Amino acid sequence: RETQIELALEKVRSRTMAMQHSDELQEASFLLDQQVRALGIKTWGCAFNIYGENESTEWFGNEAGVLHTYTVPREGIFKEYYQKGQNGESLVIQEFSGEACVAHYEYMSTLPVIGDVLKILKKTNNGFPTFQIDHVVYFKYGYLLFITRESVPEAHQVFIRFAKVFEQTYTRFLDLQKAEQQAREVQIELALEKVRSRSMAMHTTTELQ
């Protein structure tokens, strides 16, 4: 079992280590869900939630595929998850059942991108689900969300391990982005300096040609 978990973690680690752009988190979310299910943990879907200043960006994937990147406001349940993370929680288990679950889906269906998918789900399933469990696992830049339709206490530590792996690789990704940005700024400065030097060396207006 431990070997299987390590292999699943390594697949997610390798994929996120190879990221060149944050949009690739779409594919990574699908892989994350795939690897968790391969361990026998029945998930309905997995998401990466990365904090912004006043809202978060999410990438969601499940067995059916991935969604385009979407943002979620810092209100309602999202505000609650954010605040619990800021208060030092490492894992939050949130159950939705009955009318509360339907109300949660009704709210989610008002959001861009994911809302369109949920409206289709409502039609094809003759209504929204009446039970689900959110497993929110925090890391430095946000949290991972694992959605299940049943209690999976044996998976909690596995979820936490996935979050730790993702924090390491996402930190590396941010470092690479920062280094690339600095390199671009240096190139721009060099180009500007060449133009500046040439302009300073001009003696007549004909040299503008």
Residue ranges and their predicted role:
Residues 1-19, 25-27, 172-208:
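Signal-transmission linkers at sensory-effector interfaces
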Residues 151-172, 181:
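Amphipathic alpha-helical "output/dimerization" segments
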Residues 104-143, 151:
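Helix-to-coil/beta transition segments that act as allosteric "coupling" elements at the rims
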Residues 30-34, 128-132, 145-146, 150-157:
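A cross-kingdom feature marking solvent-exposed beta-strand/loop segments within repeated
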Residues 53, 61, 65, 124-125, ...:
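Surface-exposed receptor/substrate recognition regions of extracellular proteins
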Residues 38-45, 91, 168, 172-179, ...:
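Intrinsically disordered or highly flexible coil/loop and linker segments, enriched in small
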Residues 18-68, 201-209:
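Helix-loop-beta substructure at the N-terminus of cytosolic sensory domains
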